[in-house]
A protein has these predicted regions:
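ATP-dependent small-molecule kinase phosphotransfer cores
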Residues: 1-27, 54, 58, 66, ...
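Active-site pocket-lining segment
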Residues: 44, 51-55, 59-61
Length: 149
C-alpha cells in the first residue's frame, strides 16, 4: 500500500518536504526505500539494508502469525517480489543503493547483529549517541543542527 501511494507525485512531493524539514530540525534516523538517494542524499550514514526475498517473506509471515493473522507464505513472497520490481522500475526515485551507502545483507543476521552493524557504521563516521559531529558543533550552539543520520 505505501509503495503504491508513494508513487503518486503530489504525495511524494509533500512527504519529501516533511521528511527534509524534520531532518533539518533534529538528528534523525529515517527508514525508507529512497531516503539515502532522494530524501537525504547528504546524510552522514546510509545503510542499504537488504535480505533475500525468502527470508523477508518468512519474517513477515512470522510477524503476521504472531498478530493472529491468517496468511500464506508463498503469497507474501510474491508480494515482496512484485513490490521490489515496482519500486526498482518506477520513474520517480527508483529503489537503488546510494553510491555511498553501506550494503548490509541481513539474511543470516539476528536483529541484534543488524543493530550492532549499524551502530558500528555510525561510530566509524564519528557519530555517537547523544552527540553531534565536531563539524556541526558551531551550528548546534546557534540552535541549528544540520546533521542527518
Amino acid at each position: 500500500m505505501a509503495s503504491a501511494t508513494s508513487a503518486i507525485p503530489a504525495v511524494r512531493a509533500h512527504l519529501l518536504e516533511l521528511q527534509r524539514n524534520l531532518a533539518a530540525s533534529a538528528n534523525v534516523i529515517m527508514d525508507g526505500r529512497d531516503i539515502g538517494t532522494c530524501i537525504l542524499p547528504d546524510a552522514d550514514v546510509k545503510i542499504f539494508l537488504t535480505a533475500s526475498t525468502s527470508v523477508r517473506a518468512m519474517r513477515r509471515y512470522r510477524e503476521l502469525q504472531e498478530k493472529g493473522m491468517m496468511c500464506n507464505l508463498e503469497e507474501i513472497e510474491q508480494d515482496i517480489i512484485e513490490r521490489d520490481a515496482r519500486d526498482m522500475n518506477r520513474e520517480t526515485a527508483p529503489l537503488k543503493q546510494a553510491e555511498d551507502a553501506m550494503l548490509l545483507d541481513s539474511s543470516d543476521m539476528t536483529l541484534e547483529q543488524v543493530v550492532q552493524a549499524i551502530l558500528e557504521a555510525a561510530f566509524s563516521r564519528g557519530l555517537a549517541p547523544g552527540s553531534q559531529k565536531a563539524s556541526d558543533h558551531a551550528d548546534s550552539e546557534a540552535g541549528q543542527t544540520k546533521e542527518e543520520v
